Amino acid sequence: MHYTGTVWRPPYEASSLLLEVTAGCTHHKCKFCTLYDDIPFQFKMSPMEDIEADLQEVKGQFRLWNDNKVTRTFLVGANPFVLKATRLLQIASLIQKYFPTNKSIGCFSRITDIALKTEEELLELSKAGYDSLTIGIETGDDDALKFMNKGYEAKDIITQCKRLDNVGITYNFFYLTGISGTGKGEQGAKDTADICNQLHPQIIGANMLTIYPNSELYQEIQKGNWQKETEIEKYKELRTLVRYLDIPVWFAASGASNAIPIQATLDRKS
């Protein structure tokens, strides 16, 4: 299989076929992020022949076990949804060619990736099986989004995710607890809940901000430009987010960065 560097996937994609179609991140400017520092370039697309070779390899392995029932494929890379719709549709066709039982295709997406697609293209992608995208919105706090160089504003989250709603593409959010900084976390949580309450995420996964010495954010802290939240502040922030969410959604803070695992179905309606 053509995997480049560390392979990242959401916990709920554990049983999906992991197919690399991109490597690295087109944005690669978020101050807190070091996920793709182990690859020697910013971003590249996988050649279609590599993608097909990987599908052939998986099919061959499955044949040995008399099992080729792939039902979901997760495209590997920081933001494969940035690819042109024509290429994403080609990838979907290849998956269907080798695994006709495949029902849906997921991937990581930036908010800005959705903005690159027309309504017609989003509808085509929906029909081709693209669904349950994972979007690292991180927060609805505009000050934090700007400081961390996320490349979009909170209003863009609403605009682009409503476009997904309109064509029937579901989506999940990643929230980054602690991204607002000390003294600002609970307000950031309220801002995020306000955004989420206007949308229809299927899952909200919360991770605790972890600051690595090789990150740009670490340098900002050393310069006195930003102060991190205490662990108690982070859990108060998380509590505030849950308190203000008013939509039916699966909420989970169960990754390795969360000292206290939390998961529950929030059965609420606006």
Which residues does each PLM region occupy?
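Conserved, mostly hydrophobic/aromatic
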Residues: 25, 33, 51, 75, ...
